[in-house]
Design a protein with these regions (language model features):
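Sec-dependent signal peptide recognition
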Residues: 1-7
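Phosphate/nucleotide-binding beta-alpha loop and adjacent structural elements of enzyme active sites
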Residues: 10
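N-terminal soluble domains immediately following signal/targeting peptides that reside
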Residues: 18-149
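Sec/Tat signal peptide C-region and signal peptidase I cleavage site
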Residues: 13-17
Length: 149
């Protein structure tokens, strides 16, 4: 009985720890013609009122050794809580897209690396808070170092 109570307690704790976050996908997943040319699409998860969530995105890059920052427009799709990010940063250099979201009193963040063939899902990082500048720097450094190997 004690094991059962402990298991239920652990499940409840992990369920409460799972808060507002993002899920990223290919632009064809949008199933809306105007968004199929986007760099990627994403949706909010575990947001009670997704239409009221506030989302911002910035492309952070290193081009010819210099740091660049490009504010991005986040385009809402017809389904509440689903958004597209179009590539408005240059083709040169290495880039990550930094997402920040607020849903009621919860925040979420993500760092989405962009490679020559598009976003790199397996290297993307998700946070229960906005990504820290040091985390963005580390992601960019990893991408640049990967080029030199």
């Amino acid at each position: 009985m004690l094991r059962f109570a402990l298991a239920i307690s652990l499940l409840a704790t992990s369920a409460m720890a799972d808060g507002f976050t993002f899920t990223i996908g290919n632009s064809v997943a949008a199933q809306e013609a105007p968004f199929k040319s986007a760099a990627f699409v994403f949706r909010t998860e575990r947001c009670a009122e997704p239409a009221k969530s506030q989302i911002t995105a910035t492309a952070e890059g290193i081009v010819h050794g210099a740091r660049r920052s490009v504010p991005l427009k986040v385009s809402a799709l017809q389904r509440p809580g689903v958004y597209a990010v179009f590539q408005t940063w240059g083709n040169e250099g290495r880039w990550v897209v930094v997402l920040k979201g607020v849903c009621q009193n919860e925040t979420a963040g993500a760092i989405v690396p962009i490679g020559p063939k598009g976003f790199i899902r397996e290297s993307s990082k998700f946070f229960p808070r906005p990504a820290a500048g040091t985390e963005v720097d580390a992601s960019l450094k990893t991408m640049v170092e990967g080029d030199s190997k």
